[in-house]
């Protein structure tokens, strides 16, 4: 839905198109890379064919968790990233690799849902993007966060329970019903918006 409006904005190679998609599909129980990768690659080729400068993103493979589930996610996201890197080479896209800086797996950069970046995480990634684009950036983005203070056991457990009730249970319920978290949602900015806002 977003590709055609984006293509309509392309002037030439001075237009930067950033594209990040497919990572949520990796989380689904019925995930099939043989279905997801061709759709992702077709979208990338379509955007690249416009002549715009194209930027792609990988996702974290290691999040600091351990165990069989963490290993499964690492394997899935590793294969996903391999595809992203391969198509980036094919079309000559810029790539922002989330796995180049180990500190990006620091959980303090994540929102409460443990899936998306919080404001600090977004700022770090934004500075990394500016560096990749050879634009002015804050070099401190590369510095790991200070050592975290130990979290009391009870606080950890309470936080995990709150997360499970708020995010995990609704996710499981949606999967059972064959629903997606995106069903019924519309884009925050469905139409092209000038930036900076005046």
Question: Which residues make up each language-model segment?
Answer:
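Short glycine-enriched, charge-decorated loop/helix-capping segments at active-site entrances
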Residues: 31-34, 69-74, 111-112
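Oxyanion-hole/transition-state-stabilizing segment in secreted/luminal serine hydrolases
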Residues: 1-37, 61-62, 168
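Active-site segments of SGNH/GDSL-like serine hydrolases
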Residues: 20-24, 45-78, 99-105
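A structural motif corresponding to the C-terminal end of an alpha-helix
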Residues: 43-55, 83-96, 132
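Short, hinge-like loop/turn segments at secondary-structure boundaries
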Residues: 3-7, 62, 72-75, 113-115
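Charged helix-capping and loop-helix junction motifs
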Residues: 33-41, 76-81
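Conserved catalytic region of serine esterases and O-acyltransferases that act on ester linkages
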Residues: 90, 113-116, 120-198
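Substrate-gating cap/lid alpha-helix
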Residues: 64-98, 119-123
